[in-house]
Amino acid sequence: MEKRQFIKDLVLTSIAMPIGFGGMAKAFANHSEKSPSVLAEDNAFWEQIRQQYILKPDYINLENGYYNFLPQPILEKYIEHIKEVNYQGSYYMRTVQWDNKNKAAARLAALAGCSAEELIITRNTTESLDLAIGGQNWNAGDEAIMAEQDYGAMLDMFVQVKDRYGVVNKIISVPNHPKDDEEIVDLYRKAITPKTKVILVSHMINISGQILPIRKICDMAHEHGVQVMV
């Protein structure tokens, strides 16, 4: 899906949400026609988004690891749902939970541009990637490429598949100050062999904030017939 269409769909999804989400819906609606590159530098847009968060003012949090802190309207709605589930007890689990899950899947599918049957809703990114890593059809001697700067939980999961299936983990180190994108792409290219099955790569490295050239890495890997897990 094109990023511009994604933003438009996100606007429609936000508008359909309760009144408390009005601030975010308005921010997206006012800027939905702008390209991602223009929107990235639109301070007015990001100020509207920033106003939806209540964060500790003592420091600026630049790390995007651990868990995703929520905009205030979403946090309030999340707590409201938890209270309702706790209030209903087993009745909720045996009745309305499936309707709620199906409705959520349908809305996410509309946003992602796929069918609800293609979606699996997990608790977080770590669980999703763990399932994807562990669910590969691994054979002894298969190779996986990753960087030492990748998220720790993912590296731990690759240790498990190494111990369980005999997978060979090839770990590279991404330079903090590369000359250009090609230097990073070459690191992954040189690690590929006929036995390489998958490359794990972080779009943004959580410990440094460094953004990697994902499109270039993916294009290179696909030319070699290698899957990429971002």
Where are these regions (language model features)?
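N-terminal secretory signal peptides
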Residues: M1-E2
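Pyridoxal 5′-phosphate
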Residues: I7-V230
